[in-house]
């Protein structure tokens, strides 16, 4: 008995410690970021053993805003620089926060794949974000054309695949399993012939218990170890041993030789899950790029709305002054009364334009605040705050534009949607290995090794007439359970078996259909990727053309505004000398106001074109100094720029 105790201890320890080793993976992948509570003395082993069967702690969704947003509000106004807007968006924007869960979901899928489970897929949707009030207004007034806010990379929202359906050979379950079963039994069997046993019924009391361990491997191998025991007590006087205990230790091995053989087939889900970790990071990066582009557009649109409001207000002041001057001249009799009506009509039109500009400005403030807050405008403090942009639009003459070839090369190397498409093609090629393996016949090698043991005490049940039968049991089988264990480990009564099983599907239509479909799908993805590359080249070239044209339009708008200022000055001088009419002066004032608004709109359009080009070439994060690691953490290290002005 003393010789076998060390072996039993090692065997049971190995069975118990196997689940504890897997617990670290569950904790690292799914546990929340909250620090663990230290365990009380004596509970470490229980915690390690049971953590695989407890629900991991997942931190709840945080719906509050970062302190940065509140710190920017002073005296009821939200003073906002572009740098602050980007930092607040990284911390509070809901689209970015939703996308932060993608890598965590991919990590959970990777954990599932390492256990041999099917993949559930990773989210790849990218939301374009809020639309500027300029687009909602249809570009009315002097704000020209072009939509701000909802910038994005077209045709890339589904790259990577959200749902993966596995075809081909099933992946083995890679999580080891320990099992234990115990049974207590009682049976009574009436006997038609009492001559042999002298009993009208044989009664059996039995106890059995089984334990074992099973594990599958990526090579296509399945190994199971079992330990089976049975103890039987009976009223049969003919048994030499009563009660008797039978025991066996067995090992069974199955190796797949054709279908389902090899690492390339059985670890394909793990490799796909590893690729999906990269996909989830790329999706997050794409969402950050899209959101930052949208916030920058919203900010510059707000600046342009502010400038347009100032232009409209100045136009009202000019119209009012002209009206008052005409009124005085009518009173002294140097001007016809009809000229007052014309001047008053100009004031009304200018005030209407001012009202429209103020409406667009307030709408844009609301849209921007909603993009920068997790609670939108639910907070009265945020809802009532007027947004004061502290940055001015950049003049195009200070901007440099790279050549088309450099821009296309940069987009090919950096755009996350193209990288996602390449990874998806790689995933499909990995999956084809399973479909290819399923085409093969199933040939399995089976081997079994078993050691048997029997022990018990001499039967003391008497015959019906009295007395004991003549018993002469082998002393080797007489003893307790330790005797059975000794027989097992001495391998006194071994069993061996080796064989194979071959299954040949006659038509093999399912496997052939899956392989054909996977190959066709891969070719579709190749064509889709080429289409994406072609679209990227077109988008980059169009964005570059739009930027160049926007610069030219801005320069023309500046020239027009300067000429209109000169024209109005000349018209006012002619009017003072009586060489012009009030109608001509009013018309010139209207033309100048329109030219000023067109200049503001042209500058805003240039800013949007610049953002779109940076987005299409995947250089927008670098342009605005956004670190993707900081974006993933949800905490921007940028100082509050507006408070430093």
Feature roles, as predicted:
Residues 2-6, 10, 20-39, 119-158, ...:
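Acidic, low-complexity, intrinsically disordered peripheral segments
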Residues 54, 60-88, 403:
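Regulatory alphaC helix of protein kinase catalytic domains
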Residues 225, 245-353, 357-366, 370-373:
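Hydrophobic, small-residue-rich alpha-helical packing segments that form membrane-like cores
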Residues 81, 175, 206-208, 246-248, ...:
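Transmembrane beta-barrel architecture of outer-membrane proteins
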Residues 98-113, 287-312, 321, 328, ...:
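Amphipathic alpha-helical coiled-coil segments
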Residues 178-186, 225-231, 445-451:
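Transmembrane beta-barrel strands of outer-membrane/channel proteins
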Residues 76-160, 164-193, 203-207, 212-215:
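N-terminal cofactor/phosphate-binding cores enriched in small/glycine residues
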Residues 88-97, 107-121, 166-174, 186-191, ...:
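A glycine-/polar-enriched beta->alpha junction
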């Amino acid at each position: 008995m003393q010789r076998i105790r060390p072996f039993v201890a090692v065997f049971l320890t190995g069975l118990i410690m196997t689940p504890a080793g897997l617990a670290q993976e569950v904790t690292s992948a799914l546990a929340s970021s909250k620090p663990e509570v230290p365990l009380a003395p004596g509970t470490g082993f229980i915690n390690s053993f049971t953590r695989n069967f407890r629900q991991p702690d997942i931190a709840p969704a945080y719906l509050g805003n970062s302190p940065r947003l509140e710190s920017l509000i002073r005296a009821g106004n939200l003073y906002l620089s572009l740098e602050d807007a980007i930092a607040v968006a990284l911390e509070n924007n809901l689209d970015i926060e939703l996308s932060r869960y993608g890598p965590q979901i991919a990590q959970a899928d990777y954990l599932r794949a390492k256990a041999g489970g099917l993949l559930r897929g990773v989210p790849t949707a990218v939301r374009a974000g809020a639309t500027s009030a300029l687009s909602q207004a249809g570009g009315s007034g002097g704000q020209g054309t072009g939509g701000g806010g909802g910038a994005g990379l077209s045709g890339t929202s589904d790259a990577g695949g959200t749902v993966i359906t596995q075809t081909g050979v099933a992946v083995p379950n890679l999580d080891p399993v320990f099992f234990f079963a115990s049974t207590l039994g009682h049976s009574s069997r009436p006997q038609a012939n009492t001559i042999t046993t002298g009993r009208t019924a044989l009664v059996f009391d039995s106890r059995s218990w089984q334990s074992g361990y099973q594990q599958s491997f990526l090579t296509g191998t399945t190994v199971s170890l079992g330990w089976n025991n049975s103890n039987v007590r009976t009223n049969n006087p003919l048994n030499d041993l009563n009660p008797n205990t039978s025991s066996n230790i067995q090992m069974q091995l199955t190796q797949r030789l054709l279908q389902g053989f090899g690492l390339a087939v059985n670890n394909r889900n793990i490799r796909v899950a590893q690729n999906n970790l990269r996909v989830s990071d790329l999706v997050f990066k794409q969402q950050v790029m899209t959101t930052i582009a949208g916030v920058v557009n919203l900010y510059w649109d707000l600046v342009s709305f502010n400038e347009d409001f100032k232009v409209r207000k100045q136009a009202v002041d000019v119209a009012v002054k002209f009206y008052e001057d005409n009124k005085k001249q009518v009173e002294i009799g140097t001007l016809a009364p009809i000229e007052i009506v014309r001047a008053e009509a100009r004031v009304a039109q200018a005030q209407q334009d001012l009202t429209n500009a103020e409406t667009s400005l307030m709408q844009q403030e609301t849209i921007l605040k909603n993009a920068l807050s997790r609670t939108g405008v639910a907070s009265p403090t945020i809802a009532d705050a007027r947004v004061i942009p502290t940055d001015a639009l950049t003049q195009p003459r200070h901007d440099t534009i790279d050549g088309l070839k450099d821009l296309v090369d940069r987009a090919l190397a950096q755009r996350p949607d193209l990288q996602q498409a390449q990874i998806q093609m790689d995933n499909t090629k990995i999956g084809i290995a399973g479909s290819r393996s399923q085409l093969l016949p199933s040939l399995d090698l089976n081997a079994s090794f078993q050691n048997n043991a029997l022990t018990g005490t001499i039967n003391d049940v008497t015959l019906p007439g009295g007395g004991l039968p003549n018993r002469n049991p082998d002393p080797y089988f007489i003893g307790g359970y330790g005797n059975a264990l000794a027989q097992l480990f001495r391998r006194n009564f071994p069993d061996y078996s080796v064989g194979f099983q071959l299954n040949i599907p006659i038509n093999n239509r399912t496997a052939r259909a899956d392989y054909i479909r996977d190959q066709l799908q891969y070719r579709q993805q190749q064509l889709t990727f080429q289409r994406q590359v072609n679209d990227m080249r077109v988008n980059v070239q169009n964005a570059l053309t739009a930027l160049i044209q926007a610069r030219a339009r801005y320069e023309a708008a500046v020239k027009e505004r300067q000429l209109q200022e000169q024209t109005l000055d000349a018209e006012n001088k002619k009017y003072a000398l009586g060489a012009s009419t009030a109608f001509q002066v009013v018309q010139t004032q209207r033309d100048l106001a329109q030219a000023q608004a067109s200049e503001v709109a042209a500058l805003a359009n240039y800013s949007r074109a610049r953002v779109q080009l940076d987005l299409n070439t995947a250089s927008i994060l670098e342009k605005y100094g956004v670190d993707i690691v900081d974006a993933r953490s949800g905490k921007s290290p940028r100082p509050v720029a507006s408070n430093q002005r």
